[in-house]
A protein has these predicted regions:
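A cross-taxon signal for low-complexity, glycine/charged-rich
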Residues: 6-7
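HIT superfamily nucleotide-processing domains
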Residues: 10-155
Length: 155
């Protein structure tokens, strides 16, 4: 038998399956999925107080930006900039708040929030400032359609 070496046994095993990426359950509950960029899933937070996006890299078991390799880090910043530009163009906001906190939800996610001087929390952070307000279905659908167009989202 060609290639056979007496006394040596070789067993071929299938490579281990990579764990499937899944969105953290709390993020799934609190958001609407609007599409995917090359690295990150783009979500809208279910709170009409602010135009508020989340970008969640579709990578398993990543909790910090530094857990991504350098190419993915650069890609994430490119996608954050794309989200920020879209929000700024659509809302004419005064300031973008961009943050990756992860104190409550360990899965890496980046908040991109459009702020206006005089909004309900200005100039403080939005978290816990006022109770969340549900989106008007028609308004959020229009906003999502505009975001998809501006960001060239696949979804």
């Amino acid at each position: 038998m060609p290639g056979f070496i007496p006394g040596i046994h070789v067993f071929f095993c299938a490579p281990p399956e990579m764990p499937r990426w899944e969105l953290h359950p709390q993020l799934a509950r609190d958001t609407v999925n609007i599409g995917d960029l090359p690295l990150a899933r783009v979500l809208v937070i279910n709170d009409a107080n602010w135009p508020w996006l989340l970008l969640v890299p579709r990578r398993f078991d990543v909790s910090e930006i530094i857990d991504l390799d350098e190419v993915e880090q650069a890609q994430l910043w490119t996608e954050i900039a794309r989200a920020g530009r879209a929000l700024k163009e659509l809302t004419a906001c005064d300031k973008l708040n961009i943050a990756a906190l992860g104190n409550v939800v360990p899965q890496l996610h980046v908040h991109v929030i459009a702020r206006r001087q005089g909004d309900a929390a200005w100039p403080k952070p939005v978290w816990g400032a006022v109770p969340p307000v549900s989106h008007d279905r028609y308004e959020v659908d229009r906003f999502i359609a505009a975001l998809r167009k501006k960001m060239w989202l696949v979804g």
